């Protein structure tokens, strides 16, 4: 069974801004983005090291999931996955 990883406050804040942006155009688009993203986040727990190593942090336990032009940064902890941030691929992370 795939579990939803731990979502950091920073990630939730960034996701809220993204969903707010999409919902201005279409609530359905925002909902579709959200539900598909959650499915991808659940899949991280299965072989998390298959994702690319984060280039900014450059730690073996910090990886990137690419989703619809966004980079989802996550850390592999001993007993769970922690989602750290989400940003558009062409923006500088953590700015």
Label every model-predicted segment:
Residues 39-66:
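A short, surface-exposed loop/turn module that caps and links secondary-structure elements
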Residues 10, 47, 86-89:
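Generic beta-structure capping elements
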Residues 1-34:
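Arg/Lys-rich, positively charged N-terminal/basic patches that mediate binding to nucleic acids
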Residues 11, 37, 74:
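GIY-YIG nuclease signature motif recognition
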Residues 67-71, 75-95:
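Enriched for short, Lys/Arg-rich terminal
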Residues 14, 64, 69:
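Conserved acidic functional residues
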């Amino acid at each position: 069974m795939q579990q939803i990883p731990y979502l950091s406050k920073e990630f939730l804040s960034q996701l809220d801004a993204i969903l707010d942006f999409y919902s201005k155009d279409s609530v359905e688009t925002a909902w579709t983005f959200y539900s598909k993203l959650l499915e991808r986040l659940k899949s991280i727990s299965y072989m998390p090291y298959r994702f690319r190593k984060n280039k900014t942090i450059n730690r073996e336990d910090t990886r990137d999931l690419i989703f619809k032009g966004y980079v989802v940064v996550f850390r592999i902890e001993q007993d769970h996955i922690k989602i750290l941030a989400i940003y558009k691929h062409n923006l500088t992370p953590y700015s």
